[in-house]
């Protein structure tokens, strides 16, 4: 988002520096294979970052947008504070491990929901594959690809994955079905064998898929109080003709509740004192 908000023309090009190369290559992080001196557009670098999770692309963008990587990281921290994050601190642009680089699922939800308001962020983060140097780079979110039967979820869209030895496997993914939209955030999930499988499973994708299946099957947007419905009575002090008055809903009240919830289970709390006009 720092890049999208500060670069108006994503066709502008910038070069890979030696410092950006050294910060990514050889670290064990995923890279796109950008070479020192290679010139790429911001548009390409954003696709490599969001689709391929390319650490080297992140480093190039950080230097270009921030002037220095350190200043870009400051811009990142300023931006997340602006969207209400209180438990996040970044020390680098790519998410490589650092004891002082941290966040929470709650803060990541704030970051993602704010970012999803930007149409360009949606475009880059939900692209399922990107052509680069003659190769088709698939989105690192395996929930988007039918070939991965264990992980694939037809309603999934984007957004971002990340993994390090310390943080293990993480995914933020959106899913839309029948007019409902949910965001799943799974962090520090292991890679392990499940049941009798002979291979290791990235549990972040399995868990996100399970969360979506539960939400779509178990929750429903429901009108619990209809407009003009009488929901109770309140006392009236010094009433001319009555000591009470009916309390009527001015509008429908719609909330997401468990499927099959008995309306009698809904508790309506009424203020002790209500001003009648």
Predicted regions located by residue number:
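Active-site-adjacent loops and short helices of periplasmic peptidoglycan-processing enzymes
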Residues: 1-106, 113-119
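Domain-terminus/edge residues, biased toward the C-terminal soluble/receptor-binding domains
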Residues: 85-86, 99-102, 106-277
């Amino acid at each position: 988002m720092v890049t999208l908000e500060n670069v108006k023309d994503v066709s502008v090009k910038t070069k890979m520096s030696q410092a950006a190369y050294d910060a990514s290559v050889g670290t064990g992080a995923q890279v796109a294979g950008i070479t020192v001196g290679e010139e790429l557009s911001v548009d390409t670098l954003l696709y490599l970052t969001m689709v391929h999770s390319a650490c080297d692309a992140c480093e190039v963008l950080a230097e270009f947008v921030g002037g220095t990587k350190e200043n870009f990281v400051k811009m990142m921290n300023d931006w997340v504070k602006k969207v209400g994050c209180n438990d996040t601190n970044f020390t680098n642009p790519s998410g490589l491990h650092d004891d002082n680089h941290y966040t929470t699922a709650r803060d990541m939800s704030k970051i993602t929901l704010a970012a999803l308001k930007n149409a360009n962020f949606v475009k880059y983060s939900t692209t399922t594959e990107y052509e680069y140097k003659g190769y088709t780079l698939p989105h690192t979110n395996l929930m988007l690809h039918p070939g991965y039967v264990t992980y694939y979820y037809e309603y999934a869209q984007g957004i971002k994955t990340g993994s390090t030895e310390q943080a293990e496997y993480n995914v933020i993914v959106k899913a839309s079905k029948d007019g409902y939209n949910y965001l799943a955030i799974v962090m520090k999930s292991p890679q392990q064998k499940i049941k009798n499988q002979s291979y290791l499973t990235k549990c972040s994708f399995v868990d996100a898929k399970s969360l979506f299946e539960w939400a779509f099957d178990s929750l429903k947007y429901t009108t619990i109080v209809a407009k003009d419905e009488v929901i109770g009575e309140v006392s009236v002090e010094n009433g001319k003709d009555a000591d009470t008055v009916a309390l009527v809903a001015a509008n429908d009240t719609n909330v997401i509740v468990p499927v099959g919830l008995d309306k009698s289970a809904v508790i309506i709390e009424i203020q002790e004192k209500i001003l009648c006009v």
